[in-house]
Swiss-Prot record:
The lineage of its organism: Eukaryota, Metazoa, Chordata, Craniata, Vertebrata. It comes from the Eukaryota. This is Protein Wnt-7b. GO terms for molecular function: cytokine activity; frizzled binding. Residues 1-24 form the signal peptide. Residues 238-266 are annotated as: Disordered linker. Pfam families: wnt. A lipid is attached at residue 206 (O-palmitoleoyl serine). Its main location: secreted. Glycans are attached at residues 83, 127, 295. It comes from Gallus gallus. One of its GO terms (biological process) is forebrain regionalization.
Length: 349
């Protein structure tokens, strides 16, 4: 979502929060306000709009989670022809890729994980209603290992279920792309769930660790980004299996395998080969690489040869000037030299 638009939503809902505190309940006026705002957010499916209207506090967290996923996507692909950008309608989840490619698989997985991560964190911090710490991780004592649940364990199950309800609600059409998107959403959430951390604190006399109090915490989202990038590199091409009578897509199977072998839960899957992302193409959502910075000496994806797709590159020269070798003189002034450096940057034609 556009940064200014997100700030606008935040301030509007902040006003709702003030009204809520003053009145002690969400009045009909506030409900009407939430209805107006939720109808202004682009790209929401009907069920998503209904969640927005019933949980206006949650839509801010959802937007932050989706943005966290988009930011991580841009970081992971910052040196590639595709840098997590696309042509098309802007939504709370960014601009969607029209092709069911491995890039689309990554964007769906990372944003679904981002929403689950943000919702779980907001619950632990007391910033969302109807949720909090994981109640099931309280009071249990493991005598053999000498630890017990304590503190505030992150309720990852709530975050995942909320992400499932909201993110998956945009899949309306009953086609192969829907099955692909739902699988990748779930893969992103599953990776997050599997990387939850157990943190413990020791208790005992004179620094001994007679017993430990433990709780679960969320992993750094950068870790999830790296794992999903690896799964992107190993993404599995699938095809749809249709029901014999209605011919509707039923489930996905790995392509080019005769048996009905399904992909693994945490596999990223795609149904169409990726475009080369060299040129701007509205039909695929590719923005092309014209004007992108490139590295003239690199043989990798960020190198001008690969990034510019053989079109060549432009050289830009500029001089950077700054104060250097500063010395303090008694008394009392600082004297500096002026240093300069000539720099070249290269952009794709």
């Amino acid at each position: 979502m556009h940064r200014n638009f997100r700030k606008w939503i935040f301030y509007v809902f902040l006003c709702f929060g003030v009204i809520y505190v003053k009145l002690g309940a969400l009045s009909s006026v506030v409900a009407l306000g939430a209805n107006i705002i939720c109808n202004k957010i682009p790209g929401l499916a009907p069920r998503q709009r209904a969640i927005c209207q019933s949980r206006p506090d949650a839509i801010i967290v959802i937007g932050e989670g989706a943005q966290m996923g988009i930011n991580e996507c841009q970081y992971q692909f910052r040196y590639g022809r595709w840098n997590c950008s696309a042509l098309g309608e802007k939504t709370v989840f960014g601009q969607e890729l029209r092709v069911g490619s491995r890039e689309a698989a990554f964007t769906y997985a990372i944003t679904a994980a981002g929403v689950a991560h943000a919702v779980t964190a907001a619950c632990s911090q007391g910033n969302l209603s109807n949720c909090g710490c994981d109640r099931e991780k309280q009071g249990y004592y493991n005598q053999e290992e000498g630890w017990k649940w304590g503190g505030c364990s992150a309720d990852i199950r709530y975050g995942i279920e909320f992400s499932r309800r909201f993110v998956d609600a945009r899949e309306i059409k009953k086609n192969a792309r829907r099955l692909m998107n739902l699988h990748n959403n779930e893969a992103g959430r599953k990776v997050l769930e599997e990387r939850m951390k157990l943190e413990c604190k020791c208790h005992g006399v004179s620094g001994s660790c007679t017993t430990k109090t433990c709780w679960t915490t969320l992993p750094k989202f950068r870790e999830i980004g790296y794992i999903l990038k690896e799964k992107y590199n190993a993404a599995v091409q699938v095809e749809v299996v249709r029901a014999s009578r209605l011919r509707q897509p039923t489930f996905l199977k790995i392509k080019q395998i005769k048996s009905y072998q399904k992909p693994m839960e945490t596999d990223l899957v795609y149904i169409e080969k990726s475009p080369n992302y060299c040129e701007e193409d509205a039909s695929t959502g590719s923005v092309g690489t014209q004007g992108r910075l490139c590295n003239r000496t690199s043989p990798n994806a960020d190198g001008c040869d690969m990034m510019c797709c053989g079109r060549g590159y432009n050289t830009h020269q500029y001089t950077k000037v700054w104060q250097c070798n500063c010395k303090f003189h008694w008394c009392c002034f600082v004297k500096c030299n002026t240093c300069s450096e000539r720099t070249e940057v290269f952009t794709c034609k």
